[in-house]
Swiss-Prot record:
Pfam family, one: HD
Domain HD: 75-219
Keyword Repeat: no
Organism classification: Bacteria, Pseudomonadati, Pseudomonadota, Alphaproteobacteria, Hyphomicrobiales
Keywords from the named record: Hydrolase
Family label: Belongs to the dGTPase family. Type 2 subfamily.
Gene Ontology process terms (BP): dGTP catabolic process
Designated name of the protein: Deoxyguanosinetriphosphate triphosphohydrolase-like protein
One GO MF term attached to the UniProt entry: dGTPase activity
InterPro entries registered for this protein in UniProt: dGTPase, dGTPase-like, dNTPase_2, HD/PDEase_dom, HD_domain, PHydrolase_assoc_dom
Amino acid sequence: MTIDTRALGFGSSERAVYAADPWTTRGRLYQEDGSPTRSDFQRDRDRIVHTTAFRRLKHKTQVFIAQDGDHYRTRLTHTIEVAQIARALARALKLDEDLAEGVALVHDFGHTPFGHTGEDALHEVLLPYGGFDHNAQSLRIVTKLERRYAEFDGINLTWESLEGLVKHNGPLLTADGVGTRGPVPQPILDYCELHDLELATYASLEAQVAAIADDIAYNTHDIDDGLRSGYLTFDMLEEIPFLAGLMAEVRARYPHLEPSRFTHEIMRRQITRMVEDVIGVAQQRLSLLRPESAADIRAADRVIATFSEGMAETDRQIKAMLFKRIYRNPDIMRIRAGAAQIVTDLFAAYMANPKEMQSHYWVDHIAGLSDAPKARHVGDYLAGMTDTYAISAHRRLFDHTPDLR
């Protein structure tokens, strides 16, 4: 993908006309005085970093459970990697870097312990009460569950940050009001009654670069962790033409490189090529669209920050390899089954006896509730757990806790 380097931003450039503007934000649900030293998007990013939910990401994992080793990615390290890539993309495209970084930092807040396995298990037990969606849970955390301020629940982010959180993967509704990926989760609909996030339009370009940064980070670090664990080998990587090309480049330049350095050289190149591909596609689409404001980005009929056809095919090949070699590996499947059992057991135990939650706040809020609202509170409590806390809670309540190693 060809890039026009003359059009790139390098940190000192003014924002493009299509960038989100923190000085003309659509505001916050609760009116606040502005800051003399920080823009509204800077304040959003700072509020996100200071939340309890952000700190909990340190002990939430994605594929490899926390007990597997100290060097595997957690939700926190993944989030930091996504934020770095999102900020680099935003800088190159002359966007608001603080908004892009904020969306990247908050995008995983709603994830449960044990990654997608925990989410699937929690969704299953909550199905009679509306199910569970991590994106909707992220919104609940920043608008309701975080309790840090005297005047409101949540952290009162700007409309643009919340829009990016909810719509970073694209519109949730068609123009006719039909869900683009199934029914829109009720918590999102409820919030839109108060503060319409315009679910039928695309999000800002800042949110779009955060979304594609998530894909880039996932693909890269799951390969890195897969090689570290032994579930992937260099021979497996060479089955994908893009990765085979990167490996050939590294071998040609460093013919006697040790395996760990060889891996990192591949990963560096993978991130760079994918980032450059996205920049090139975005430049092409922006030149065709000729947007004059952030509103023009939202009104566009397609995403702007995305992979080229060739890189999208590479993305599919990498995901297929990871699914086959890691996510469906028998060892990982055994661990996933145990993790799902922990979530299911804890939900049943807390529904039967909320006092087992050992938290006055949650117990006081559940007292006297019917099953549906009680289940939602229990779901909130479980979703906020880290891997390590969920394991210890299960050990306290049950005679046998699955071995997740």
